[in-house]
Amino acid sequence: MTGKEEQRVDEKRNALLTVGLVCAVLFVLGVADLCNSDRVYSESENRVLASRPVFSWESLLSGKYGDAYEEYMSDQFTGRDKWVGIKTRADILFRKKEINGVYLGSDHYLIGVNDPEKYTQQMEDSRIVSLKKLVNRWDAKVMLVPTADNILTDKLPAFAPCYDETRLLAKVKESVGEENYIDVYSALQEHAEEPIYYRTDHHWTSLGAYYGFLAWADSMGKFPYPYNTAGMKTVSEDFQGTLQSRINVAWTKDKIQYFPETEKKPVTVTYDFADTADSLYAPEYLETKNQYGFFLNDNHAFIEIYTGYNAGKTLFVIKDSYANSMIPLLTAHYETIYVVDLRYFNGKLFQLMEQYEPEQGMDVLVLYDCIHFLEDFKFY
């Protein structure tokens, strides 16, 4: 056998060994997937994982079954969390600036990617039509909080595309009118050099929520309760939020802080018409990955808050999770606060509001971040 023939044999053998090794790995992983029960929830990613889709010929022919099964396999893949972390380290090594929907910003900021092509004018207009119904019926105040990519622009990688939320905010302001629009964008922009967003999570911090509270008070013509920002209490120094979960590697740790003045008077908090607590905070969440759940015991369809302040004053809040860290600041101005999260509430919104509206009326606040307003603001 000549040297060239031996080389070809070696190459063929190596190729077969490689194919065999890959097949063996895939076989082992496949067996592991079959043996392991599906996970319902990812603690590291703080989200519900996709479950096995139900087969039907209709869903198969439409392509929906294939898409759902692909998502299911991606979520339930054995060792998924470790593989995500390995891929992230490789991407960082190759100096990638966007990983799994997260920009690696300067000063150790992780900033969520909001694709400008995803959020269309049609989507904006549809949400604004629903919003206008609330404003017309209830004289609602509207606060749409810009996400970090629109305020911390100096932290973004060069030329990083992001959805321009100022377009949405201008349309909302024009639609609902200046009297009902709360300009929190300007308030946050003015304090952009301060830690108003978490470095590893998509929410604003308690300091950011405080500036939102001041913007709300100004729009209402109220003298704001004098919370002391220098006196904020730190309850955690190892928070790593939703954005860190997406890249699944260790990152800078955030602090969870709150205003202790919100605990001066006793409160009664009822969650989902059943469970009752005597605090606006749930410290048990500080022992979990989802430490932001410390505020208002995470997310619930409906919350009732009774305080010792301002007899007869009632506020009804329609919100996403951004509101969770600001609502405690509002308790100094109302005796009763009702809170509904449309992502979990399946009833008729106006019917619920009419049921809880007192004879003397109530204030209504719509509080979302801009992205979740576009994605989740729907009611019946």
Give the positions of each predicted feature:
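Extracellular glycan-modifying ectodomains
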Residues: 1-380
